[in-house]
């Protein structure tokens, strides 16, 4: 019963309701637990979540700082095309329409912004705010060493939850934002 309430609370906090609740539960299972008890742990979900998080953060940065000068929004282009065909004028004296992507930030600044958004302490702080780390399912050694208090473990949990949402949602971009 307690576990059911915890995962109901987690779903409410993240704003996503799982079709397959086992995926959410797996996001909370550490390898130390599965080494002792068998089953699947959160490591692959964490790997997936790390990549999804990178994509989501880059997407947010480009929505904020990127554009195409002819007026198309980056949101339309991020969704794999605006439906408008690119064309070029035959007369070489005429200025061609610019359809090149422009970003108000250079690559270095975008990289620094992305790094700041996904750094360990940022993700760990969010897990602290939500109180999720206290619900990790761990083996005896992890419990004894209080690994659920470590930033890297909280970061792993954050990423594993995102990975679980990615799989459960069928990689739906709306759900992953």
Segments predicted by a language model, with ranges:
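Double-stranded RNA-binding/processing signature
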Residues: 1-177
